[in-house]
């Protein structure tokens, strides 16, 4: 059941998390309300932060103020806080208050640009995991040459056993159905080869669990070289490998895009030719890889919707992270995960 106020979907916002907070958060909430709300859906915010910094922004962004409730918090989690320190000592932080709001039923989900490790630690401590879920995983949507795919885990679990990878695959499949709107997503395990004998014990063990598992369209192994080809819908890895692969792919894409801009737009003649011949196709390709519209990573498996926006998110990026949360809530993602793993003993 959705957490609502007057039939609105309620989202808790950590106003102090991120490099450009609280402006990116409040402006982002305003951008979301103005541009990204789907017809028939109403969204209400619980905003947590420092009143001296947030209150002036709420006076400026009237639409946010009219669709929110603000709570002052005397502390905030810093970017360099260790998760254990944030959990024990940031008792009145905006991040913790937002998560507690979910625990108490005041909101159904949280959006934060704050410290990833702290957000996971506090969320797991306060909310716990869904029934039958051993470990939560961080999942995100990534662009490829032809379409988008879901990738998990992105850093929540450095070491994973076969059972955890198996659960990540189940959760990733359900996540992809909602986030990518695919009826029967194809799922693969990231490995150093496609042969069944390749990989470590955890990966091979997960393969054995998945190859005959009901309710999942498992396609075996995939190599990192195929990541951007768009031949699969969900890629599953442990948190160490997944995080390294994602950051490598992001850096490669960023370098390539900047190289294209540098080489193509280095003269007015090139700009004119591109404008005439390739502008629409180039803009379409650049939009597909635009990080602003893919700002949110989701903590799957927790007893509440938690969205982590990039630490350097601007208002537009944060707005898209809010939309990510709203979609997950409106589609009842967590209940579908519970149903999808209910057969696990």
Curated annotation (Swiss-Prot):
SUPFAM superfamilies: Isocitrate/Isopropylmalate dehydrogenase-like. It catalyses: a fatty acyl-[ACP] + phosphate = an acyl phosphate + holo-[ACP]. GO terms for molecular function: phosphate:acyl-[acyl carrier protein] acyltransferase activity. It holds the Pfam family FA_synthesis. It is an enzyme of class 2 (transferase). GO terms for cellular component: cytoplasm. Pathway: Lipid metabolism; phospholipid metabolism. The keyword Lipid metabolism applies. Its EC number is 2.3.1.274. Keywords: Cytoplasm, Lipid biosynthesis, Lipid metabolism, Phospholipid biosynthesis, Phospholipid metabolism, Transferase. It is found in: Cytoplasm. One of its GO terms (biological process) is fatty acid biosynthetic process. Homodimer. Probably interacts with PlsY. Catalyzes the reversible formation of acyl-phosphate (acyl-PO(4)) from acyl-[acyl-carrier-protein] (acyl-ACP). This enzyme utilizes acyl-ACP as fatty acyl donor, but not acyl-CoA. This is Phosphate acyltransferase. It comes from Wolbachia pipientis wMel.
